[in-house]
Regions:
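Structural motif
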Residues: 18, 43-44
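SH3/SH3-like beta-barrel fold
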Residues: 45-49
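Short glycine-rich, low-complexity segments
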Residues: 1-30, 50-71
Length: 71
């Protein structure tokens, strides 16, 4: 993805689908979240898991802070 519009289109096209979100944290700490893309807004989108909701910005996707694998 090269633009914010491509990132938004990717998320919107996978709305309601089960995804794995790999989060690259500080000091090489990685976290993987399995959930469903449940909400899309202007600047953020929300992934629902069984236990909690987690919000991400489209910028995170562009910068490679998170990676989304659609299942």
């Amino acid at each position: 993805m090269r633009t914010i519009y491509e990132a938004k289109d990717f998320v919107r096209n996978n709305f309601g689908k089960t995804v794995n979100v790999k989060i690259h944290g500080i000091r090489n700490k990685n976290e993987i979240i399995k959930g469903i893309i449940s909400e899309c807004y202007k600047n953020i989108f929300i992934v629902n898991t069984n236990l909690f909701k987690r919000s991400f910005s489209y910028k995170d996707l562009l910068l490679g802070i998170i990676k989304i694998d659609v299942k």
